[in-house]
Amino acid sequence: MFSGSIVALVTPLDTDGEVDYNSLKSLVDYHIKAGTNGIVAVGTTGESATLSVEEHVKLVMKTLEFADGRIPVIAGTGANATHEAVTFSKLFHDSGVAGCLSVTPYYNKPTQEGLFQHYKAISEATDIPQILYNVPGRTAVDLLPETVARLAELDNIVALKDATGDLDRVAITRELCGENFIQLSGDDATALDFVKLGGHGVISVTSNIAAKDMATMFALAAQGKFEEAEIINQRLMPLHNDLFVEANPIPVKWAAHRLGMITHSDIRLPLTELSLSAQPTVEQALKSAGLLK
């Protein structure tokens, strides 16, 4: 259902801070041409935290429109209030989204039982396939493998995006949830190793600007050609790392603009554009990856 290289798509903005739908269409077409296996619209990289509900819904629907059935679209639907996460998921009922990506509730630090009840409520409210999203570095809460296993028993909770960077969890989660439960890395730098250990793919920041390389790398991995995949991975490693020299998605939006993929690198406050001191680092990473001369 979900595998390979799935992009956590940036949300292009104009200089007035409004969504640039022309650039969005270009990005969708770019990923289809490059062989990307799926698009996450309005996740963390898509600046979900600073979009209004109306913008959020329109962005997902426009992404679906531009995709036109040519690539699966996953809607970001996470919130730190359960009723809001439920509402977001229900808004996309019959929309054509392939699934919903729902981050753990952030800031309010629920217990494991609270996390279970949160996702259970979402599961009961919709039949859209749900992807759990664990990123404790941003949310201050860790969805433990034992809780994932409880949730995996619910019919439409089908996958986990694991952005912990803890590769030991791949085998633990596989043992607890079974091999059919989909595990997706949320950490580009360790994603290939994640797949070597039994994961199914990645939801990627790097893929925003190196989509063909990422798609090829994970296609090779799926064929067991890990040595060939590792050659690509090592070339992209500076990008995997330096796209986080400042908070995501600041560097990747700057890089996408530098490559002419989006019209502007604007980002909504409280995030600010990539600092002058960090720009040479990202520029060099683009050159190391072969994306700039």
Swiss-Prot record:
Q: Which SMART domains does the record cross-reference, listed alphabetically?
A: DHDPS
Q: What is its main location?
A: cytoplasm
UniProt-annotated site: Part of a proton relay during catalysis, residues: 44, 107
Listed under GO cellular component are: cytosol
List the Gene3D superfamilies hit by this protein, alphabetically. Aldolase class I
Annotated catalytic residues: 133, 161
Which reaction does this chain catalyze?
L-aspartate 4-semialdehyde + pyruvate = (2S,4S)-4-hydroxy-2,3,4,5-tetrahydrodipicolinate + H2O + H(+)
**Membrane-traversing stretches:** none
Detail which positions bind pyruvate.
45, 203
A GO molecular-function annotation: 4-hydroxy-tetrahydrodipicolinate synthase activity
Subcellular location per UniProt equals: Cytoplasm
Q: What is its EC number?
A: 4.3.3.7
According to its UniProt entry, one GO biological process term is: diaminopimelate biosynthetic process
Keyword match Cytoplasm: yes
Domain of life of the native organism:
Bacteria
The pathway where this protein functions is:
Amino-acid biosynthesis; L-lysine biosynthesis via DAP pathway; (S)-tetrahydrodipicolinate from L-aspartate: step 3/4
Recite the UniProt keywords alphabetically.
Answer: Amino-acid biosynthesis, Cytoplasm, Diaminopimelate biosynthesis, Lyase, Lysine biosynthesis, Schiff base
Broad enzyme group: lyase
One Pfam family named in its UniProt record? DHDPS
Q: What InterPro entries would the database entry show? A: Aldolase_TIM, DapA, DapA-like, Schiff_base-form_aldolases_AS, Schiff_base-form_aldolases_CS
Which family is this sequence assigned to?
Answer: Belongs to the DapA family.
Q: How does it assemble?
A: Homotetramer; dimer of dimers.
Provide the protein name.
4-hydroxy-tetrahydrodipicolinate synthase
Top-level taxonomy = Bacteria, Pseudomonadati, Pseudomonadota, Gammaproteobacteria, Vibrionales
Gene from which this protein is expressed: dapA
